[in-house]
């Protein structure tokens, strides 16, 4: 996931092409403009300019991934006949992902057919996925949409996951991990005496919204099914290594998920 206003586009072109080559064409490319005004300002970016910078940086990135020489004249970035020596293995470029929760950005993602991932309660994400699908349906045949090489976009929802042999063990691990995860998410805001996002990421909110899914394989399987059904998504993005979870806990969680949860969702 690259916050484009924080990167020099020409260097990013080279990094993306190299990553796709090294991974054998398995790179999935997430792009965004950033949601924290404090983070943007730390990099010398005016939050008011982040939308325009994102649009220009994305145009430069995609041009550089698909052309032999790069020329671009914008308000924020300018390049003149720059040779591009390395290109991605996937053509024309790796599939694009766009995480968002604002109506305008959701329409933008759907219009271009970006793979999309939403946050928050499944019911709220359902509104977003419905809006995405409307935009996608209206623009799927547009010749100039940016993710045109992706025939069926992934419409995802993000969840933090802990699977253990017993429900109580999974809950204890999730509670402990969440304390540090919460501090890391809110730290920069708190340094500016801003607590406006605390409620979005509290343990109580996570339980209410099912943004953290924990339990035995049976419990997690049921929760995953409910999330997928209620959200209208066709893809669930799971994070197994977060907060203070040890490598052993994360690997055990992932193993249980793969062996005892995923088979229930096999499609053929």
Where do the model's predicted regions map?
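Active-site-adjacent structural elements that line small-molecule/cofactor binding pockets in enzymes
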Residues: 1-268
């Amino acid at each position: 996931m690259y916050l484009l206003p924080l990167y020099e586009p020409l260097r990013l072109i080279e990094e993306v092409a190299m990553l796709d080559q090294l991974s054998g064409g398995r790179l999935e490319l997430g792009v965004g403009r950033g949601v924290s005004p404090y983070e943007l300002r730390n990099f010398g970016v005016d939050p008011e300019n982040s939308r325009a910078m994102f649009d220009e940086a994305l145009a430069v990135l995609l041009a550089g991934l698909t052309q032999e020489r790069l020329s671009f004249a914008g308000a924020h970035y300018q390049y003149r006949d720059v040779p591009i020596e390395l290109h991605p293995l996937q053509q024309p470029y790796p599939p694009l992902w766009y995480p968002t929760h604002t109506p305008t950005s959701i329409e933008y993602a759907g219009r271009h057919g970006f793979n999309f991932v939403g946050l928050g309660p499944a019911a709220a994400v359902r509104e977003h996925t419905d809006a995405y699908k409307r935009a996608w349906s209206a623009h799927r045949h547009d010749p100039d949409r940016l993710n045109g090489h992706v025939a069926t976009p992934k419409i995802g929802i993000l969840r933090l996951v802990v699977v253990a042999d017993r429900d109580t063990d999974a809950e204890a691990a999730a509670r402990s991990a969440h304390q540090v995860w919460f501090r890391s998410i809110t730290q920069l805001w708190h340094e500016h005496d801003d607590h406006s996002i605390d409620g979005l990421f509290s343990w109580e909110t996570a339980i209410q919204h099912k943004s953290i899914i924990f339990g035995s394989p049976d419990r997690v399987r049921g929760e995953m099914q409910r999330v997928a059904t209620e959200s209208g998504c066709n893809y669930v993005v799971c994070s197994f290594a977060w907060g203070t979870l040890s490598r052993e806990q994360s690997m055990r969680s992932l193993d249980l998920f793969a062996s005892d949860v995923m088979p229930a969702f096999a499609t053929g």
